[in-house]
């Protein structure tokens, strides 16, 4: 409850800072302040935020009084179905047709990158709360980007370095074949090697895979001490269950 409310208050605060300053003031001259939320509402990452994340945003808006400088706050939401083109199209439509002032992006790094690009083009604030790719922190960060979520560099340094210190020297990666998986595997591998460990192999699985048994057999055959799961949500659960 506290985390969700704090998250939402951050969004409201950024809305005020971004919308009601300088040239952005004219962008919020319509009858309401519109905040969009695009995430996975029905797929493998839906339990990470999904409808729960939407409700948290609505609760935060209510806590804030439902208004910013006398204008009501309206929350729009959509399911990107884990497709970058759908996420980008909806974000663009909301700005052009609904007067969207700020967008909150949920899980899935590929969709987050596409929404980030659209919002930069439209000069609107984009808050990433669910995607972990370090590209949002680094080369694809814009003056309109707020990366509230952790990124894969931070995750890799905190986790891999601790495992190495405990003796986990040889690694094999099971990688979700999209932006987040690639970033996490690459960043973790860099930490492993810099810490004196080795990466004996990796294998990519399609984002749609729910049966990861065959991939895990290859990981087992590698004789690595550590299996690094560079995936998330339902796919991480499936991998853990299959590993049993």
Where do the PLM segments sit?
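Gram-negative bacterial Sec-dependent N-terminal signal peptides
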Residues: 2-25
């Amino acid at each position: 409850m506290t985390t969700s409310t704090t998250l939402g208050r951050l969004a409201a605060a950024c809305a005020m800072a971004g919308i009601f300053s300088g040239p952005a003031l004219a962008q919020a001259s319509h009858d309401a302040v519109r905040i969009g939320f695009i995430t996975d509402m029905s797929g493998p990452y839906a339990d990470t935020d999904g409808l729960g994340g939407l409700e948290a945003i609505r609760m935060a808006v209510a806590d804030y009084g439902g208004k910013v400088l006398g204008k009501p706050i309206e929350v729009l939401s959509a399911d990107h179905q884990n497709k970058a083109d759908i996420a980008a199209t909806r974000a663009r439509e909301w700005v052009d047709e609904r007067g969207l002032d700020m967008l909150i992006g949920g899980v899935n790094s590929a969709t987050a990158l596409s929404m980030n690009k659209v919002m930069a083009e439209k000069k609107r604030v984009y808050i990433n709360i669910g995607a972990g790719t370090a590209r949002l922190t680094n080369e694809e960060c814009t003056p309109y980007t707020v990366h509230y979520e952790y990124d894969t560099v931070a995750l890799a340094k905190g986790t891999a370095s601790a495992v190495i210190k405990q003796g986990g020297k040889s690694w094999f990666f099971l990688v979700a074949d999209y932006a987040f998986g690639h970033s996490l595997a690459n960043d973790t591998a860099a930490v492993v090697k810099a810490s004196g460990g080795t990466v004996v192999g990796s294998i990519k699985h399609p984002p749609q895979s729910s049966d990861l048994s065959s991939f895990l057999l290859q990981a087992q055959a590698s004789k690595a001490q550590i299996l690094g799961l560079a995936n998330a949500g339902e796919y991480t659960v499936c991998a853990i269950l299959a590993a049993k």
